[in-house]
Structures are given as C-alpha cells and as structure tokens.
C-alpha cells in the first residue's frame, strides 16, 4: 500500500468512530470526567466555559442515559459517573444514582455554564473543585483533544503547540487528497485494509431500528413509517432512506443509549454518510466488499469536503455529507466516476442553503432531507444530468468544493453569530 493510502486509512480511523450522544455536550462530559479523575475526590462545584458554537450545539439535545437536555447535565454527569478512558462514549456506563447525583449538583447551583470568547470553534474549559483540590481541563480543536491540564493551578500537561493538532479541522492538511484520489482508493484498495469501515453499518442501522421501535424527539422516522403502514404513502427505496436516516437521528438527538458511528465529530453526519448508502446497497444486493468501497467514498469524501471549512459553523454539515453519500450511491448503481462527481455537484446545489441552528430534535428532519437530496441527485447523475456553472456550483467538482468552503468560512460567520444570539436571548 502506498503512503497516501495509509494516510487515508489513518484519517478514517481517527475521524469515523463510535460516539454516544451528541458530541458537543459529550465534549463537556469528557472534560469533567478527566478533571474529576485528576482530583481523586468528588466534585463539589463545576464551572464550564465553552465556545459559541459548542454552546449552540448543546442547548437543545438530550444527553444519553440522563433523560435531560444541555451542557449542565452533561458536565455534571461526566463528573459523577463518566469514564475518561472511553472518550466519546464517556457516559456509556452511567447509572441512575450517578444521574441523580449530577442533578443534585445542578439543583444546588453548583454547576455553571458560560460562553467564552475564543477563536476555536470546538472549545471547552472546565474547572472542577473538590473539598481539597481543584482541577482544570481545556479541550480545543477537537471534541476530545485536551490541550492543557491544571491541578491546583499547576500545569501538569500542555500540548506542544508546535505539533499539528489531531483534530478534524486540520486532518487533511498536507495530505494529497481529491475526489478523484478518494474514488481511486475506494475502488482499488485491498478489501482487508478497508473492511473496518463496515462497523458503521452495524452501529447506525441499530440506531435507526431503535428510533423506529421507540418514541424519540419528533419521531420523524416513525411518522413516515406509520403513514406507509396506513397506505397514505408508498414504500420505496426513497422512503426507506428517509425513514431510516430520520429514525437514527431521532434516536440520537433523543438521547438513546446506543452509539452512532460518527463522521467528522458528528453522529448525525455519520448517519448521513452511512444509511443512504446501506439502503442503496441493499437494493442492488451488493456484497460486503462493494459496500465497504462505497463507505470509503461516502465517509472519506465527506471528511475531505468538510475539511474546507470550520468544524462548527452556521452551515449544516449533513448537506455536504450527503453529497459524498450520493457519490457512493452512484457507484453502487454501476455509474461512472464522472456521474459520481455529478451527484456531488447536484447535492451541493440542492442543499447549500441549509443552516445549522443547533443540535436538537429537528436535526432528524435535516438529516432526512439531506439523504433524500442524495437520492434525487444520484438519480439525476445516473441519467447524465449535472448542475454546472450555476450559483456556487462550478464546472469542476473540486472548484465547487472550494466555493462552498469559501462561502461558509468567509461568508457565514455573521449569520452564525446572529443565530447564536437569537438562541441565547
């Protein structure tokens, strides 16, 4: 295997991984779990300082195993029952007594959450005080990327600032990667080297099944399934994609105790990169090797596109994640590389106006809409229809990706600010 392909596998293994609960509040839970471990005693007070974007994406989402919403319960639960060794699955073994203990801290006014001015989009600093000591943990640039630890005001760990951060924001820096090279890797790599990606199907389909079995959030997936059962809607590949993607997001945003296989720090985006591809593969009776190759396109393609703009912004990441899913869906249908590129162009054209106004139950609608766009865009591409040189869509897919990155990075910060101020008011 050449060195570039090894880099691709490293990227995938670093960025496509299980996460229990929405990753923004889980970031705070992870930080407090580490700080409490440093203390060696029970937490008595917890102060949480977060970036505007982390604040935005934590306000309306349920925290797994708690039945509650927001940063305060996430941070408190991380301190009372989090396992710092579990990373993004820090709350996987949280007990009800630990949840009760966390709620008692909140009710006593011992957990405070504040926004902090910072240039980082993913940023969380926690100060946890016990009876004898106090510990401070700072995460910056990635949901579990600790850059500093302090115990009783003494720095006991500091990340070397000269080293490149292992965060999603920079993970493609210095890597020779394009849509063409991703396609080449996906179609020619040895199956044994890429079959690890199949775990995405197991986790995200299980999450979808949970969302169909039990009521979570807006019950988008269950509602569509109910209307198919009554005959108002017809069952089809398109409806299956909508139902399963929405149901998985329903469950995730509703605090289901099951992990998602995330993409770029987002469980919903992991769902968007996985489930439409699974459903297309099922339709064509694709074998595991073909599915794995399609997953490489959807997951690595999504990572590559999203590396052109900040990891948290005013733009809904499911939009371009679904563009990469559309690329994979064309491949599964027997389309050409050129048609896969057309699918990306079509999806970005369709979804480029979708904003992010925080992680919450309505994400299930956006995930479903993005997945349906991937289906629509792949069908257009397979019939040789492609959006070109219209709006932000260029003649070439690489230029389109650069355009969308520019639009988000330089054009949307003010929109993001206003969204956050509206939500906080």
Swiss-Prot record:
Residue pairs linked by disulfide bridges in the UniProt entry: none
Annotated InterPro entries: Ser_deHydtase-like_asu (IPR005130), UPF0597 (IPR021144)
GO molecular function, one term: L-cysteine desulfhydrase activity
GO biological process, one term: L-cysteine catabolic process to pyruvate
Family membership: Belongs to the UPF0597 family.
PANTHER family: UPF0597 PROTEIN YHAM
Superkingdom of the organism of origin: Bacteria
Protein name as annotated: UPF0597 protein VSAL_I0741
A matching Pfam family: SDH_alpha
